[in-house]
């Protein structure tokens, strides 16, 4: 991925460096599937807590190229399962995800004892960000 300028990265952090809703598009057999997901942005990627057996993850296993859209932002990226949410990892700090998603994370919807509760990373490859009349492409 081409790096964001420092200004664009700051806009990304302000808009998406917290619990936010984005649309995530996957494809199966040339048919697009779009859904809203809770995500947060950090260092060129979005992170989503999801279930390994969900349709989105089945689609991503067969075709990791995804599209996302948020507030004045569209992009493509590669979806990768980082594995079980409770596993220690270097790429993503689960404590940060728990903090970011604190408003809803313990509402019973997510079972952290289930090893199919995973972190989906969408590493951005290209996109367009608009902010106050400025167009940032990467």
Regions found by a protein language model. Give the residues of each.
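Extreme N-terminal tail/first-helix region
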Residues: 1-18
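Charged, gly/pro-rich active-site loop segments
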Residues: 2-3, 74-138
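Generic preference for well-ordered secondary structure
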Residues: 8, 23, 32, 44, ...
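A generic secondary-structure signal marking the coil-to-beta-strand transition
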Residues: 12, 20, 116-118
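Short secondary-structure boundary/capping segments
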Residues: 13-14, 38, 109-112
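Short Pro/Gly-enriched beta-strand edge/turn motifs at strand-loop
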Residues: 17-23, 100-105
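Short beta-strand segments
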Residues: 19-52, 58-60, 66-70, 80
